[in-house]
């Protein structure tokens, strides 16, 4: 009996070793994307997996010295950190100056194309630094990796996986108009009720909005096929056979989508798409002593948390003074993450910080509102803790994210370009004083928390699943094996139309033949 128990114990320990000792290689994207995926990597390490990150020699947030729990393979690149900052500043300026409207849409997408061309150049350097570097590739080949975790915003992660002969998993929020998910992942997206990502539309669209939605999808498809299509020749060269970017991306085993139904509008998905939105969220921890003392001085009015994220460093003096003037007029105390010059209009109720523990502040019982730029990470922390928002979106997905929160009744938006002190003040008073905003924020929070598995656990499970089973091919839809005309059943429709046309033609011929026969018979009788 004891022998059997020991054998069973050894068997389970062996299984545990198989599950818990994976070797993961990571192809990341810098910026806020890294801040999100790092939480997932920390959890993988906690579960006894080895994690190696392929990081370029110049980055914004990926720091091998600070993240000692992770192994880093440095990729030599010739661009500098200032080049990355320049691209980000260009992106912010593009959205602020030409935020997509019917009048600015063409200019916006033209400039976006130029920006993508610049991004292509820097991204390609990272690709070459690995794929065309025999020394790095040899080390990776000897690494014994089980799976590659990639953010598809930065190209070539899938190429590294294929060259190493291992499966790969994606982690992403979305691509513009879901181009990658639709064309490469094959998810259906009925344009009648699925708003294109970045369109700032909801699933309740008027006729005019549906027209805008179709235009948004069409423009993003054009950009994807034109600018991102430049990768096709590169991918074909690396793999040594004709292929496309999309065909290669379509080989992803699992797509970990950093969203959930507390954030998204209902729409169809596929079985290899898993929702892990808010995986970085966690219960609030105690605040630093000095910060807690300031929070407690707010009394019954509570506090407002204000952050424009990690990518926006400074504002113009005029804009900073405008904001500070509005904040000075509310009874709440304000904790503002800001590194710029101290505004002349800064009120006694407002304190500036180079950095704030945002999640811990949003989880504080005295927090009444969150002024946010609309980044996904910050919005999910607000959802997690049930805090209503004032959105001041600036670029990329931020306007679209705030549009989602407005539609769900948990946010008010203020336009960064045109806002006045009164606009910001009125928006703050609205979300703080009107109970519906807090109620809707709490409703989203309850939806987020009421899941059978926590988002972080779900993400780890599917990465481990791919390692255990060497992939997840059983979840891959047959759409990947169809041509575009087969996918839309155009061949079948054409065949059926041909059959109908043939039948109509045959009936017409028969009728004509009968009429001719009847006519000849009638003429013959008359002659007789």
Swiss-Prot record:
InterPro entries reported for this sequence: UDP-glycosyltransferase, UDP_glucos_trans, UDP_glycos_trans_CS
Record EC number: 2.4.1.17
SUPFAM superfamilies reported for this sequence: UDP-Glycosyltransferase/glycogen phosphorylase
Leader sequence segment: 1-21
Topological domains, Extracellular: 22-494
Cellular location(s): Membrane
Topology with respect to the bilayer: Single-pass type I membrane protein
GO cellular component, one term: membrane
Keywords tagged on the record: Glycoprotein, Glycosyltransferase, Lipid metabolism, Membrane, Signal, Transferase, Transmembrane, Transmembrane helix
GO MF entries: glucuronosyltransferase activity
Cytoplasmic side: 516-528
Sugar attachment sites: 48, 314
Membrane spanning stretches: 495-515
CDD domains, alphabetized: GT1_Gtf-like
Catalysed reaction, written as an equation: glucuronate acceptor + UDP-alpha-D-glucuronate = acceptor beta-D-glucuronoside + UDP + H(+); 17alpha-estradiol + UDP-alpha-D-glucuronate = 17alpha-estradiol 3-O-(beta-D-glucuronate) + UDP + H(+); 17beta-estradiol + UDP-alpha-D-glucuronate = 17beta-estradiol 3-O-(beta-D-glucuronate) + UDP + H(+); chenodeoxycholate + UDP-alpha-D-glucuronate = chenodeoxycholoyl-24-O-(beta-D-glucuronate) + UDP
Alphabetized PROSITE patterns for the sequence: UDPGT
Matching Pfam families: UDPGT
EC class of the enzyme, as a word: transferase
Further information: UGT2A2 isoform is part of the UGT2A complex locus which displays alternative use of promoters and exons. The locus is defined by 2 alternative promoters resulting in 2 functionally active polypeptides UGT2A1 and UGT2A2. Alternative splicing of exons results in additional isoforms for each protein class.
Function, in words: UDP-glucuronosyltransferase (UGT) that catalyzes phase II biotransformation reactions in which lipophilic substrates are conjugated with glucuronic acid to increase the metabolite's water solubility, thereby facilitating excretion into either the urine or bile. Essential for the elimination and detoxification of drugs, xenobiotics and endogenous compounds. Catalyzes the glucuronidation of endogenous estrogen hormone estradiol. Contributes to bile acid (BA) detoxification by catalyzing the glucuronidation of BA substrates, which are natural detergents for dietary lipids absorption.
The family this protein is said to belong to: Belongs to the UDP-glycosyltransferase family.
Protein name from the UniProt record: UDP-glucuronosyltransferase 2A2
Organism in which the protein naturally occurs: Mus musculus (Mouse)
């Amino acid at each position: 009996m004891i022998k059997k128990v020991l054998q069973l114990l050894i068997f389970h320990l062996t299984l545990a070793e198989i599950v818990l000792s994976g070797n993961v290689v990571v192809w990341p994207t810098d910026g806020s994307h890294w801040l999100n995926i790092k939480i997932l990597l920390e959890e993988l390490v906690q579960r006894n997996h080895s994690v190696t990150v392929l990081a370029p020699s110049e980055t914004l947030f990926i720091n091998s010295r600070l993240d000692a729990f992770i192994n880093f393979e440095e990729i030599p690149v010739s661009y500098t950190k200032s080049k990355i900052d320049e691209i980000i500043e260009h992106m912010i300026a593009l959205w602020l100056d030409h935020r997509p409207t019917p009048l600015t849409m063409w200019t916006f997408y033209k400039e976006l194309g130029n920006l993508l061309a610049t991004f292509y150049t820097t991204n390609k350097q990272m690709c070459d630094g690995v794929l065309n570097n025999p020394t790095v590739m040899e080390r990776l080949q000897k690494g014994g990796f089980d799976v590659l975790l990639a953010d598809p915003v930065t190209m070539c992660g899938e190429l590294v996986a294929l060259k190493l002969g291992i499966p790969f998993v994606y982690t992403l929020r979305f691509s513009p108009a879901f181009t990658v998910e639709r064309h490469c992942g094959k998810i259906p997206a009925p344009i009648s009720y699925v708003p294109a990502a970045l369109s700032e539309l909801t699933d309740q669209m008027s006729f005019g909005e549906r027209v805008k939605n179709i235009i948004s999808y069409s423009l993003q498809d054009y950009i994807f096929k034109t600018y991102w299509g430049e990768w096709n020749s590169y991918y074909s060269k690396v793999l040594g056979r004709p292929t496309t970017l999309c065909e290669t991306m379509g080989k992803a085993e699992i797509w970990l989508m950093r969203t959930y139904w507390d954030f998204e509008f209902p729409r169809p998905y596929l079985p290899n798409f898993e929702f892990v939105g808010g995986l970085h969220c966690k219960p609030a921890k105690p605040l630093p002593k000095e910060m807690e003392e300031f929070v407690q001085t707010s009394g019954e009015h509570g506090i407002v948390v204000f952050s424009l994220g990690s990518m926006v460093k400074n504002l113009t003096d005029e804009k900073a003074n405008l904001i500070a003037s509005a904040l000075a007029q509310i009874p709440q105390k304000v904790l503002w993450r800001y590194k710029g010059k101290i505004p002349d209009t800064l009120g006694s109720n407002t304190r500036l910080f180079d950095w704030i523990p945002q999640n811990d502040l949003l989880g504080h019982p005295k927090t009444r509102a969150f002024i946010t730029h609309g980044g996904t990470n910050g919005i999910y922390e607000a959802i997690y803790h049930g805090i209503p928002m004032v959105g001041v979106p600036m670029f990329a997905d931020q306007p679209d994210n705030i549009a989602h929160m407005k539609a769900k009744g948990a946010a008010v938006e203020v336009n960064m370009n045109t806002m006045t002190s009164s606009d910001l003040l009125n928006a703050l008073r609205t979300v703080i004083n009107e109970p519906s905003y807090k109620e809707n924020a709490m409703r989203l929070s309850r939806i987020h928390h009421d899941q059978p598995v926590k988002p972080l656990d779900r993400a780890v499970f599917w990465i481990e699943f791919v390692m255990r089973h060497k992939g997840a091919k059983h979840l891959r839809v047959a759409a990947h094996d169809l041509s575009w005309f087969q996918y839309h059943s155009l061949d079948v429709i054409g065949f059926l139309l041909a059959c109908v046309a043939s039948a109509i033609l045959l009936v017409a011929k028969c009728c004509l033949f009968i009429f001719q026969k009847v006519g000849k018979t009638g003429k013959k009788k008359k002659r007789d």
